[in-house]
Structure formats: C-alpha cells, structure tokens
Design a protein with these regions (language model features):
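Motif-centric detector for short Cys/His coordination patterns
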Residues: 1-101
Length: 101
C-alpha cells in the first residue's frame, strides 16, 4: 500500500509540473523595486513587494534573499518568514484574504 501511495504522489507531481507554472529562478530587482520570477516556460512575472503580505516594508537586503523551492512551485524568504505559491502569485494572490481586503 505504501508503494502505491508513493507512486500516486509521484504521478500527481509529474502532472502538476507539466500543467502548473514553476519558477526556475527568482530575485529582487532593486532598480525597479520588483520581485522577478523567471518561469520554466520561459515567461517572466514580476510584482512590487509592497503588495505582498510579509514583504511590504522589508529592506532590499532581506528581499534579495528569496529562495525558490526545489519543485519550483514556491518562493521563500527565511528572514521574513514569508512563503508564496508561484501559481497563486500568478493568479493575483499576494496574501491571505483578510490581508488583501
């Protein structure tokens, strides 16, 4: 049963990787004051940190410490304790519903 569950999880991950946007890299561009995400598809997406929960008001040094998750489906800032889903960011979700209201 455990092997079956692992196989199903791997299959789901393969499908998600094929149809959902994944980040190849991400960085903070201080000159434009934007977080830039380079997607595996070759497209680029960027947004100002001021509109994102946990990033608003952060220093350029802290914003520059963005990490892409190994699967490419998330961004993480350790010092800021901030995490974002790449598909959610592309859909315009920059925080919780309460924060965005």
């Amino acid at each position: 049963m455990k092997e079956y569950a692992i196989a199903k999880a791997r299959e789901a991950a393969t499908i998600a990787n094929a149809v959902e946007p994944r980040a190849e890299s991400a960085y903070y561009d201080q000159s434009s004051d934007r977080i830039v995400i380079n997607l595996k598809s070759g497209a680029t997406f960027s947004f100002p940190p001021e509109i994102a929960q946990g990033l608003a008001g952060a220093s350029p040094e802290d914003l520059a410490e963005v990490e892409v998750t190994p699967s490419g489906d998330g961004l993480h800032w350790e010092k800021l304790d901030a995490d974002f889903s790449v598909p959610a960011l592309l859909a315009g979700v920059f925080g919780t519903a309460v924060w965005m209201a």
